[in-house]
Amino acid sequence: MASYEYVSPEQLAGFDKYKYSAVDTNPLSLYVMHPFWNTVVKVFPTWLAPNLITFSGFLLVVFNFLLLAYFDPDFYASAPGHKHVPDWVWIVVGILNFMAYTLDGVDGKQARRTNSSTPLGELFDHGLDSWSCVYFVVTVYSIFGRGSSGVSVFVLYLLLWVVLFSFILSHWEKYNTGILFLPWGYDISQVTISFVYIVTAVVGVEAWYEPFLFNFLYRDLFTAMIFGCALCVTLPMSLLNFFRSYKNNTLKHNSVYEAVVPFFSPCLLFILSTAWILLSPSDILELHPRVFYLMVGTAFANSTCQLIVCQMSSTRCPTLNWLLLPLFVIVMVVNVGVTPYVESILLFTLTAAFTLAHIHYGVRVVKQLSNHFHIYPFSLRKPNSDULGVEEKNIGL
């Protein structure tokens, strides 16, 4: 398994022909953030590899997740009568979230600035973004939490899926049209949430208990904004871009079946994970919501990364992700009946297995593409073909 190759020779050949094509029409991104990023990128030395910037931003997102997991493990810290998250934590999380967003915005500019743009860089960026979705959503949840003043863990589960499907829609579009239409919601949500974290530190979580307008609570506004943005903006725009490509006869997949294949694994993941929640004898989502979310988000990220590889290499997306097989088995076992202790062990084991499998997938794909393009993933130095494998082995790739 240590030398397993996930990227096929056909896909490697497809990467050689790949040309980046994206459309960004978001006014916030075009007129505010891009000028800001153009200034920030000048701070970085020209020897700094773009992938190192990307990975650093991802680590900040994970750190925020772990920080709030420590202070708010079960999402009760924001509820009345419970010990709240310290104000300084919200300030740290807000600053680091904006820093992560900034690093995600400047990595591509650093690549163009240093003339080091490669398909690996885009895959690395978007692959980590797919995993960041779950960390970002679950971290935001701590602002409201659950309880009388918050949102139930099942509603948050549904909100997580809305975000996940919104993310994969962009890459489904590109899989079919060849063009990545950058979603508006990403930039708006990152700036807004970074600000909300800081505001929470100033006014306290108690401020979110109060009605916003006409007895409309902030938690309801939070929920409505996510559902509304997905249903009224993200989904219609994706379908519009798809049908424009269909009308112009530029679709890359002519049959309906081939066009929707990328949705099979995510939909099966949704069905299986929801079935587990509904069939659980111990109400597993109530017991371990944070771990359950992480399990779902990691499995989703793995399927999304496979889609991105196929989309960039112009190859067919796998019909199903075999990573879902153990989840199917566990759902069947839970349906028969298990004790709460055993069910918890199954969840923690599966989450650990998904995480290790996804990390293995990522490391191996990065190594394959690094070897193929004769580059180092985290250095701008150009390796000799004879020593590339040796040095990567030394740094753990």
Swiss-Prot record:
CC per GO annotation: endoplasmic reticulum membrane; Golgi apparatus
Residues annotated with N-acetylalanine modification: 2
Location relative to the cell: Endoplasmic reticulum membrane
Catalytic activities: CDP-ethanolamine + a 1,2-diacyl-sn-glycerol = a 1,2-diacyl-sn-glycero-3-phosphoethanolamine + CMP + H(+); 1-O-alkyl-2-acyl-sn-glycerol + CDP-ethanolamine = a 1-O-alkyl-2-acyl-sn-glycero-3-phosphoethanolamine + CMP + H(+)
Domain of life: Eukaryota
Enzyme Commission identifier(s): 2.7.8.1
Pathway note: Phospholipid metabolism; phosphatidylethanolamine biosynthesis; phosphatidylethanolamine from ethanolamine: step 3/3
GO MF annotations in UniProt: ethanolaminephosphotransferase activity; metal ion binding
Membrane topology value: Multi-pass membrane protein
Cofactor(s) it depends on: Mg(2+); Mn(2+)
Residue ranges of the TM segments: 47-69, 84-103, 123-145, 150-172, 179-201, 221-243, 256-278, 291-310, 317-339, 344-366
PROSITE patterns: CDP_ALCOHOL_P_TRANSF
Biological processes per GO annotation: ether lipid biosynthetic process; myelination; phosphatidylethanolamine biosynthetic process
Keywords: Acetylation, Endoplasmic reticulum, Lipid biosynthesis, Lipid metabolism, Magnesium, Manganese, Membrane, Metal-binding, Phospholipid biosynthesis, Phospholipid metabolism, Selenocysteine, Transferase, Transmembrane, Transmembrane helix
Gene3D superfamilies hit by this protein: 1.20.120.1760
InterPro entries for this protein: CDP-OH_P_trans, CDP-OH_PTrfase_TM_dom, CDP_ALCOHOL_P_TRANSF_CS, CHOPT
Function: Ethanolaminephosphotransferase that catalyzes the transfer of phosphoethanolamine (PE) from CDP-ethanolamine to lipid acceptors, the final step in the synthesis of PE via the 'Kennedy' pathway. PE is the second most abundant phospholipid of membranes in mammals and is involved in various membrane-related cellular processes. The enzyme is critical for the synthesis of several PE species and also catalyzes the synthesis of plasmanyl-PE, a lipid required for proper myelination and neurodevelopment, from 1-alkyl-2-acylglycerol.
PANTHER family (alphabetical): ETHANOLAMINEPHOSPHOTRANSFERASE (PTHR10414), ETHANOLAMINEPHOSPHOTRANSFERASE 1 (PTHR10414:SF47)
Family: Belongs to the CDP-alcohol phosphatidyltransferase class-I family.
Protein name: Ethanolaminephosphotransferase 1
Organism of provenance: Bos taurus
